[in-house]
Amino acid sequence: SHHAVTRQQWQVLCSSSLAAGCLRSGDLHWPTIGTDGEPVLIDLSSSDQLSAAQAAALLHEQTLTIARLAIRPRVLVVVGGDTLLALCRALGANSLISETAMDRPGWGCARLAGGIWDGLVCHTRSGAFGSENDFLEVISELQKNFRSS
């Protein structure tokens, strides 16, 4: 997204202690994404202005690459409805099953049904709103939950 709110949230996240996990869409050539168990944070937005058709084609290609290269994560966080739909299609998920969402404004949670990441829990929200720390706080909360379980 080129939206200022989303850009600021990515900047805060990638300036944090999680910066080593921040990838741009051009970094999706790794042999395997996510092999070290640390969060992998992938900003799929293009640095160029794109038409709607170009953006859709790029997102399709990016999500197919993620489906092909990424190790199945313990949990998934996706921002943006178009991104979630494209990723579900790339992974072969045929539906989402509602789960209990985090206690955060605008965030939802569902389990992927079908496909190569069947059963994976996904926290999601639409793009372009929230505080500048929203991404960082969500990732930090999920990490804390995994450490305590």
Task: Please provide the spans of the model-predicted regions.
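Active-site catalytic microenvironments in core metabolic enzymes, especially phosphate/sugar-handling
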Residues: S1-S149
